[in-house]
Regions:
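Negatively charged, low-complexity tracts enriched in Asp/Glu with abundant Ser/Thr
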Residues: 1-14
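Local beta-strand/beta-hairpin segments that build beta-sheet-rich folds
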Residues: 4, 55-56
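Short secondary-structure boundary micro-motifs
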Residues: 6-8, 41-43, 65
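Short aromatic-glycine-(Arg/Gly/Cys) micro-motifs in beta-strand/loop hairpins
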Residues: 14-55, 79
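Boundary/linker segments flanking structured domains
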Residues: 1, 73-84
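A short, charged, amphipathic alpha-helix used as a generic interaction element across diverse proteins
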Residues: 60-78
């Protein structure tokens, strides 16, 4: 059974279409690392990637809405997200 698992892991490494990560089978374990292309695509977010939450709140003025967006971006940055 473990042998079949290693074969499956090797096939999945080979089939990784968009080069999101690179894998290497060492003994019976699969070691993966994120490639630079994936880091460019999703920034520094923890995997899996998801959309940032947006509220459907309506602000009184354009300036107030813009300020709220800046506050949200600052909060994301503080939590370790890289804002593009």
């Amino acid at each position: 059974m473990p042998v079949r698992l290693v074969v499956t892991l090797k096939q999945s490494v080979r089939r990784c279409l968009y080069r999101r990560w690179e894998g290497q089978v060492v003994g019976r374990e699969l070691r993966t690392k994120t490639v630079a292309l994936e880091r460019m695509y999703r920034g520094n977010t923890p995997y899996p990637i998801g959309r940032t939450r947006r509220t459907a709140k309506v602000y009184a003025s354009h300036a107030e809405g813009a300020r709220a967006l800046k506050v949200m971006a600052a909060r994301r940055r503080a939590r370790g997200y890289r804002v593009a």
